[in-house]
Amino acid sequence: AAAVLATTSLVCTQAAADARKPNVIIVFVDDLGWTDLGCYGSKFYETPHIDRLAGQSAMFSGAYSSCNVCSPTRASLMTGKYPQRVGFTSYLNPNKPSGANSAATHLPASETTIGEAFQQAGYRNGYIGKWHVGSEEVGMPKQHGFDWQMATAKHGLPASYFFPYKWRKPSTADVPDLEDGKPGDYLTDALTDKGIGFIKDTVSEGKQSFFLILGHYAVHTPIQAPKNLVEKYEAKKKRMYGITPLTMIPERFNRKVPARQQNPTYAAMMEHLDANVGKVVTAFDELGVTKDTIIVFTSDNGGSCMPGSFGSRPTSNFPLRASKGWNYEGGIRIPTFITWPGTISATKISEPVITMDIYPTLLELTGCEQLPKQTVDGRSLVPLIHGEQKTLNRPFLAWWYPHSNGHGTQPCQAILQDSWKLVHYMEQNETELF
């Protein structure tokens, strides 16, 4: 009888393991432009690991961020809603907690976040890196469904990409929880290593699937990278462009954007990011969970092309127009793809999709309960991914940005409908139709 009981228990345990839901990781990159990857057309940056992963994915050529700056897009990912619906209209400024820059200062407790949805479904959830939708006082990842959090600075950028990831004086940009590093360590490496540690711990325990958001601060300012990689791209810049001067493209409000990618330090940051994506994929292979893991790769807004206080312009979004902070394509078009080996076939999808679609898509892919009253604006992309539909039949996409910002734009809204796009500047009462 004991033998029968043991066998039955073993069968039940195996059945439970077989029925376990797939793991999920969202690689959420900061300020990554649509043309910053080789698979999206970059000739200057080198991203072989990301390109290889994208080639195995459902790859979206018409993916948009929910806003042209970070905090609203991040709120949209967490809620499955337009950011303006939950009060996020611009990036948060931790030095002005009264709500300057945005109508909201944190995610409302009434929202069932994507973290809470996966927690309720039995996942072990982790969040590492850039958060920027609240602070210790008003809601960090652990208050929104994540069992484990690490390195979530109050600010939207790190004080430094080099250990100890702090400024000389205490700052809201100081990155916490990474004190066990050493001089010379690089932040993108540290975040990835800690994230892989969370994955290994969860897999070794064997009790739960994992849901992890790996929120890289890269490639946001400050533009910093190891010297040897910077030198590599300085040489590449000379080979590619010689003494040909950089062309600057005029933009509204007396702004200009670069017509080509040529920043060696930014290129070095990109290579570091790429190597770390490769490191995550290798970890999945070594753990034997590759076919049990969904990878979402995306960005929070378009690439930053304006000079600002950190020196030279990080990147160029050409042939897209303008930059992060603008509602033209360069400010809101982003690279996005979803990988699940053995389940999602390699395909390219041109239908316009947006950040808030990720939440309902992952619920459907993992077999978790759909939350239509929560994800009221997002649409599941599963029919597109599996080729069951060519379109979502969505009436339009909309962007609302009632602010000026350091990237040069003015209060602006935009609507995308079919192949038409309308951009309206509120204070100037000027409308453009493309």
List where the protein language model places each region.
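Short, well-structured beta-strand/strand-turn elements
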Residues: 122-134, 366-375
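Bacterial Sec-dependent signal peptides at the C-terminal "C-region" and cleavage site
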Residues: 5-20
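N-terminal export leaders
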Residues: 1-4, 24
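His/Cys-centered metal/cofactor-coordination and adjacent catalytic loops
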Residues: 84-114, 173-174
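Short active-site alpha-helical segment characteristic of glycosyltransferases
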Residues: 114, 130, 358, 381
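Loop/turn elements at helix/coil->beta-strand transitions in domains of secreted/extracellular proteins
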Residues: 20-25, 56-61, 120-126, 144-147, ...
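Active-site nucleophile/metal-coordination loop of metallo-enzymes that catalyze phosphate/sulfate
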Residues: 65-90
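Active-site-proximal cap/lid insertion segments
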Residues: 29-45, 52, 61, 65-68, ...
